[in-house]
Amino acid sequence: MVIMKAGSSRCAFSLGFLVGSCSLYVFLRQVWFEESFSWQSNGRSSPSPPISHEQNSSNLTWRVEGSALINLKHPNQPGEDGHIADELFKKVRILCWVMTGPSNLQSKAQHVKNTWSRHCNVVLFMSSEEDRSFPTVGLGTGEGRDQLYWKTIRAFHYALKNHGHEADWFLKADDDTFVVVDNLRWILSNYTPEQPIYFGKRFKPYTKQGYMSGGAGYVLSKEALRRFVEGFSTKVCTHTTPVEDLAMGQCLEKMGVLAGDSRDSLHRETFHPFIPEHHLTGKFSKTFWYWNYCYYPIVEGPQCCSDLAVSFHYVDPVLMYTLEYYTYHLRPFGYQHRYQPPVPAVLSLLSQTVKTTTETQRSEEGAKEKPALTNSVNPRAEEVQTTETSYKITNAAQERNTTHRSAG
């Protein structure tokens, strides 16, 4: 009997010691964060001198400023008509920061640098260590999954403090995420950066309004980012879990930031947490956790993904270049898109100018009796511009915009 009591006491002591140790660890990590984070806020440790050099000086498209890549103009292929995308590039400014690490710079981050990041206005590669040759921002954290939220907190603070004036929206993506930035711009053009809102692949557990998957990437308005940073200065938000995307969602919910609906008018998702083939071919087992996490009903097969898809996750370097080719180069001859979304309201004047110019060109071509097969888009396609689908998209975007304005 005495032996049993002694054993029970030892178990109770061990359990108490374990709980106390875990609590102390969390407390000390929080204290460490608050003290060590002062490198951002009070300038105790000044950043490295800025590096500035230009690429393609004969036809300048981007330059390096400090640890940032600045894309000076929207990239287009020779002979390509990208005037609408070019205008949105100027009016919907997106800062893209990419979560990476020293061991991933050449194996992963370099391929992001070569592909989709060229469509962002500002690009930052966030790492635990500074690398001025790549370049990366050194966040002064460790590496590993338990460091993801630390890196995210510091990265967003850094982005707002150092580049807040250069962007309206702030996208977080991993170094194995592929993003179609131009499609993201179209979604964001229906909102304003003054609205406290963010978008991504919406999950539902553990928060009232849901939260956005970290792997698929998520984008914050400038006001949402301001509130996120404020949440830490007021201690409304703290680092209590290493689960980055969930902790992010919980903080933003506390700060009154709305979790936006980024689906298209046909309720197809735009942000995707897996590679395209997993969504398109229905490879998800019914016991897979994904079924219990998705905020909206899962659709498998060809209708899984919007024609204006924004992102895919777990993309290896080969697939990164493949998706870049499929997105910006591959075209089937003789076909129009299933629907052509309406030009955003912010570009309505440009749209009218383009329409007038197109009609003038069409008249001139008719007068010259050019052959039917030309290198331009089929003129008749523009005469059938407003389809039932595009009408629904316009209404859906306007309704969401009105709703979010009221909520903001």
From Swiss-Prot:
Cofactor(s) named in the record: Mn(2+)
Chain residues that bind Mn(2+): 174, 176, 313
Chain spans, region Disordered: 356-408
Entry's EC annotation: 2.4.1.122
Residues annotated for a glycoprotein binding in this entry: 289
Localization terms from the record: Membrane
Positions of UDP binding: 99, 143-145, 151, 174, 313-314
A Pfam family annotated for this UniProt entry: Fringe
Biased composition range(s): Basic and acidic residues: 361-371
Record-annotated membrane-spanning stretches: 13-32
Pathway field: Protein modification; protein glycosylation
Comp. bias regions, Polar residues: 373-400
Residues with glycosylation annotation: 56, 59, 401
Cytoplasmic side: 1-12
Catalytic reactions of this protein: an N-acetyl-alpha-D-galactosaminyl derivative + UDP-alpha-D-galactose = a beta-D-galactosyl-(1->3)-N-acetyl-alpha-D-galactosaminyl derivative + UDP + H(+)
Keywords, alphabetical: Disulfide bond, Glycoprotein, Glycosyltransferase, Manganese, Membrane, Metal-binding, Nucleotide-binding, Signal-anchor, Transferase, Transmembrane, Transmembrane helix
InterPro entries in alphabetical order: C1GALT1/C1GALT1_chp1, Fringe-like_glycosylTrfase
GO cellular component, one term: membrane
Gene Ontology biological process terms, A to Z: angiogenesis; kidney development; protein glycosylation
Topology feature Lumenal, residues: 33-408
Similarity section: Belongs to the glycosyltransferase 31 family. Beta3-Gal-T subfamily.
Functional summary from the UniProt entry: Glycosyltransferase that generates the core 1 O-glycan Gal-beta1-3GalNAc-alpha1-Ser/Thr (T antigen), which is a precursor for many extended O-glycans in glycoproteins.
Subunit record text: Homodimer; disulfide-linked.
Protein name: Glycoprotein-N-acetylgalactosamine 3-beta-galactosyltransferase 1-A
Organism of derivation: Danio rerio
